[in-house]
Swiss-Prot record:
One BP annotation, GO: translation
Keywords, ordered alphabetically: Ribonucleoprotein, Ribosomal protein
Protein name: Large ribosomal subunit protein uL13
Entry's Gene Ontology molecular function annotations: mRNA binding; structural constituent of ribosome
SUPFAM superfamilies recorded: Ribosomal protein L13
Quaternary context: Part of the 50S ribosomal subunit.
Length: 143
């Protein structure tokens, strides 16, 4: 009898990849990152096991938003109190915290459960082209 291979959590080997966000559309970049974080690029992908790799995103400040999204698209958050809805447009968000824009886009594409919260921790985003992860010997992602 043949059965489908299911990865075990202790068998998963993780790699580190770097992605340059310069002039890449935010959504397309985020979907590519989410695929790597989930492990869907591997033949050993198993839905209930975190088989993904680590991703280092560089030059987050140079990410591209097409059309008028830079000024018209908003990110909303709520404090939990009445009247506590806060809105910030992406132009302000990219000027103040460019890392946050990519993190939010990727987080929306990951599962909304314990596994998704574990996956988002493997994402490292930096505004410039410097990162402190040289010891992990990251490879550039060829996607």
């Amino acid at each position: 009898m043949r059965t489908t291979y299911m990865a075990k959590p202790h068998e998963v080997e993780r790699k580190w990849y770097t992605i340059d966000a310069t002039n890449k559309p935010l959504g397309r970049l985020a979907s590519e990152i989410a695929e790597i974080l989930r492990g869907k690029h591997k033949p050993t992908f198993t839905p209930h096991v975190d088989t993904g790799d680590y991703v280092i995103v560089l030059n987050a400040e140079k990410v591209l938003l097409t059309g008028k999204k830079r000024t018209q698209k908003h990110h909303y958050r709520h404090s939990g109190y009445p009247g506590g809805l806060k809105a910030i447009n992406y132009e302000t968000l990219l000027n103040t915290k460019p890392e946050k824009a990519i993190e939010l886009a990727v987080k929306g594409m990951l599962p909304k459960n314990r596994l998704g919260r574990k996956m988002i921790k493997k994402l490292k985003v930096y505004a410039g082209d410097e990162h402190p992860h040289q010891a992990q010997q990251p490879e550039p992602w060829e996607g």
